Amino acid sequence: MARDTGGNVASGLIVVDKPGGLTSHDVVARVRRLAGTRRVGHAGTLDPMATGVLVVGVEKATRLLGHLTLTDKEYQATIRLGQATDTGDAEGTITSARPAGHLTLAQVQAAAAALTGEIQQVPPAVSAIKVKGRRAYQLAREGTPPVLEPRPVTVWSFTVQAVRPAQAGSPGPSPGSSPGAAPDGSPGASPDGGPGDLLDVDVEVRCSSGTYIRALARDMGDALGVGGHLTSLRRTRVGPYGLSVARTLDELASELTVLPLAEAAAEAFPVRHLTAEQANSLSHGGRLPGLGGAAGLGEAAGLGGAAGPGEAAGLSETAGPVAAFAPDGTLIALIQEEDGVARPLAVFVP
């Protein structure tokens, strides 16, 4: 376990491969016990049924988390066509059921294509979005699901990998969660998922933060006229952090792998090198002259050649946070350039 000179767990990121059945907060609680500190948070909530990459910050790295959630994400998912649920996933109650066995691969691909690009997405009613100070899921559980407004999201790719008949016993709402006829009065498909009634669609999605894969499943089903919900979800990447660097909770219990703060910032953000004078000023909350683009951005000194993601791309001053490093490779702050001035978003020293 990496610790600082005072014997405390070192500041940094822990990339967890979250198991199904745990909330993101459950994972944070486990990491708090493993790290011996309460200063732990996570970036980008995963639903309990979902598995995969959950980025957890420890100590000073918790200040990175609010900015990491702005990055794009990748998922592998299975969508069940022929049943809609009140939550948009397999943990909900079936609200409608229609035969989907007649659908072709081309039709499913067309529905996915229509949900690709910059779209307006209505979040699921059972979500953590706040409505007049309360979470939407709380209102939904009380029998008054809120009407949520569409939000702009970007789906860079929505790839259909396979379309297959749903198998009996495969993940989905329990057969007893809905009658055979759909509540909306349509004849409906059997909730048991009889032969030809239901289709499972395996997809890969790359999307912006804030995109609900449950909503993509719902909207695909609606577009095809049969309803749809999510039966499995695995997040394979958040920004630069993929499954290859993720560790299970059991693995972390054996060895707590912490990505050091400076290295984590260099991987997640473009890098700006500072003079000693600039580093001192910024560490005390001072502002710096802006660069007006990518000039001066590149590899972080003393980080083994790690390069920030903005090194090769010409960045505008509105591109997002930049990691500012002192000449000795110490991460000083995240900065944002606006109107020709770079101001600190989060300072990490002293």
Question: What label would you give each PLM region?
Answer:
Residues A2-A168, G196-A215, D219-S244, L334:
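RNA pseudouridine synthases
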Residues M1-P19, H25-H42, L46, A50, ...:
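Accessory RNA 3′-end/elbow-binding domains used by RNA modification enzymes
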